[in-house]
Amino acid sequence: MKKSIGILSPGVALGTAGSAMSSKFFVMALAVFFSFAQVVIEANSWWSLGMNNPVQMSEVYIIGAQPLCSQLAGLSQGQKKLCHLYQDHMQYIGEGAKTGIKECQYQFRHRRWNCSTVDNTSVFGRVMQIGSRETAFTYAVSAAGVVNAMSRACREGELSTCGCSRAARPKDLPRDWLWGGCGDNIDYGYRFAKEFVDARERERIHAKGSYESARILMNLHNNEAGRRTVYNLADVACKCHGVSGSCSLKTCWLQLADFRKVGDALKEKYDSAAAMRLNSRGKLVQVNSRFNSPTTQDLVYIDPSPDYCVRNESTGSLGTQGRLCNKTSEGMDGCELMCCGRGYDQFKTVQTERCHCKFHWCCYVKCKKCTEIVDQFVCK
């Protein structure tokens, strides 16, 4: 959703003798304005539906609640149209965004950039304006989150336009096993996620060969990589039937993989993401042509990552000052790498944990609370 920006106050008249603005300066001012406006527009994202999700409030579903879609921050015009048509889907779009954000923060919890969110509709701040491999991962995991949420909502009967999976019986399923049950509707989840998530990119028009057109292609590719990862990791789940658990009969269905498995797979793709550039035909090609071309499940990026060591308002980097680090680790979570060589401070803190747990018949576990003083380290 675009933010309104006042260009000129009513009291300013162009072309009057009292105006000190020359035509040349005016053109320059407009150029700056539209550049700024572009940044503001790009700052909005549907990811904001995953932050304190407003569409979970019951009052938005009252009859005639059409204003809901126009009031949701971050939606493009195409996404607002889909919102009007499928209002019952919006809660699960928000859940998918939230799932993606949480998984991003888990996967990057020990990295200099830890998927921190900011308090506005951009969700991740200005860092997403850079076509880096971190941006690539974020687009992929959020698109994957929507497929995950929509597929499960169909299975649970929460949506009026879909139900249980209609996936064909796998050819390698044993003949005496039944194919049925109520599986996650991954086909529907994939299709709707593609329609909704890609809508913003497909309605943007930029000159062929421009940086903006490269970002659109990058975003679309990574959205698809996230969706396909969910689709390809889905597997057959089965339940036994029979007397005393003999499992003489099995009923099987299609089931989503645990989303942590999706996050792990996308994190591996992040580590091997392909650097891309636009060719003369306006297509993305690899910077290093000696490598194999990325598949539809690989992540791609067009910009080098910014310096995440220090706070930088222009790139959106929050820096690592104040981040906890592991003194004994030689990995990215270690104080040497996390603190970028600046050193670290040590302090003591009290931790409380459950301990001495015992099982009582029947049927509960009772624990005591134990406290200990531990050393912690934070980057200078």
Curated annotation (Swiss-Prot):
Its main location: secreted. Glycosylation is necessary for secretion but not for activity. Palmitoleoylation is required for efficient binding to frizzled receptors. Depalmitoleoylation leads to Wnt signaling pathway inhibition. The keyword ATP-binding does not apply. Disulfide bonds join C104-C115, C154-C162, C164-C182, C238-C252, C240-C247, C309-C340, C325-C335, C339-C379, C355-C370, C357-C367, C362-C363. One of its GO terms (biological process) is positive regulation of meiotic nuclear division. Residues 1-35 form the signal peptide. Glycans are attached at N114, N120, N312, N326. Residues 36-61 form a propeptide. GO terms for cellular component: cell surface; extracellular matrix; extracellular space; glutamatergic synapse; postsynapse; Schaffer collateral - CA1 synapse. This is Protein Wnt-5a. One of its GO terms (molecular function) is receptor tyrosine kinase-like orphan receptor binding. The gene is WNT5A. Forms a soluble 1:1 complex with AFM; this prevents oligomerization and is required for prolonged biological activity. The complex with AFM may represent the physiological form in body fluids. Homooligomer; disulfide-linked, leading to inactivation (in vitro). Interacts with PORCN. Interacts with WLS. Interacts with glypican GCP3. Interacts with PKD1 (via extracellular domain). Interacts with TMEM67. Induction: In cartilage and cultured chondrocytes, induced by interleukin IL1B. A lipid is attached at S244 (O-palmitoleoyl serine). InterPro entries: Wnt, Wnt_C, Wnt_CS. The keyword Lipoprotein applies. Keywords: Chondrogenesis, Developmental protein, Differentiation, Disulfide bond, Extracellular matrix, Glycoprotein, Lipoprotein, Secreted, Signal, Wnt signaling pathway. Ligand for members of the frizzled family of seven transmembrane receptors. Can activate or inhibit canonical Wnt signaling, depending on receptor context. In the presence of FZD4, activates beta-catenin signaling. In the presence of ROR2, inhibits the canonical Wnt pathway by promoting beta-catenin degradation through a GSK3-independent pathway which involves down-regulation of beta-catenin-induced reporter gene expression. Suppression of the canonical pathway allows chondrogenesis to occur. Inhibits tumor formation. Stimulates cell migration. Belongs to the Wnt family. It is found in: Secreted, Extracellular space, Extracellular matrix; Secreted.
